């Protein structure tokens, strides 16, 4: 089994992605972390130029992945533009399963809904979603929520 964890490398999102990597590796599941990075680093500018954003290292094929997990911070009540561009640029996804997660300190807004909508336009199968909310840094106790999220969807992969 092959898993791709694609995430915007900011704060708690990175910690959650790395936690997924640990969990999968302990279960002897192949996992690859993919930080979603665009040439434009300034998030405010990303919102203004989303349609023109270019990924630094686009993925050509996702056929080898049984599951793709996509993570974003919640900024301005939605997913970051770089993640949206990543989803839009994905090749055919009908044979892949997806899980989505978002992190934020307040209301979840439309982050998961936005990512789900972009994936549904590609006929993707989303098996689970989760918003991790905390005003504090994720510690081992908070990361147990990540483990619980994994447990929810592990039988579907």
Mark where each language-model region is.
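Generic structural signal for helix capping and beta-alpha/helix-loop junctions
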Residues: 40-43, 108, 136
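Charged helix-capping and loop-helix junction motifs
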Residues: 82-88, 112-116, 142-147
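N-terminal beta1-alpha1-beta2 submodule of the flavodoxin-like/Rossmannoid cofactor-binding fold
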Residues: 1-71, 77-89, 150-157
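Structured loop/turn residues at beta-strand edges in well-structured enzyme cores
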Residues: 63, 93, 124
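Short, conserved loop/helix-junction motifs that constitute active-site signature segments
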Residues: 89-95
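Short, glycine-/small-residue-rich phosphate/pyrophosphate-handling segment
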Residues: 99-134, 141
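Glycine-rich phosphate/pyrophosphate-binding loop and the adjoining helix
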Residues: 56-58, 125-157
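Alpha-helix N-cap/loop-to-helix initiation residues
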Residues: 13, 76, 107-108, 139
């Amino acid at each position: 089994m092959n898993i791709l964890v694609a995430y915007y490398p900011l704060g708690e999102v990175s910690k959650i992605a790395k936690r997924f990597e640990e969990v999968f590796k302990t279960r002897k599941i192949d996992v690859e972390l993919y930080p979603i990075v665009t040439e434009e680093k300034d998030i405010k500018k990303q919102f203004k130029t989303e349609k023109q954003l270019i990924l630094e290292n686009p993925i050509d094929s996702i056929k080898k992945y049984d599951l793709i997990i996509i993570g974003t911070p919640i900024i301005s009540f939605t997913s970051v533009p770089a993640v949206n561009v990543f989803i839009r640029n994905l090749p055919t996804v009908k044979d892949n399963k997806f899980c989505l997660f978002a992190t934020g300190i307040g209301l979840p807004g439309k982050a998961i809904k936005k990512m789900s909508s972009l994936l549904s336009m590609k006929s993707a199968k989303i098996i689970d979603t989760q918003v991790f909310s905390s005003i504090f840094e994720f510690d081992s106790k908070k990361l147990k929520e990540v483990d619980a999220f994994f447990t929810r969807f592990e039988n579907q992969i």
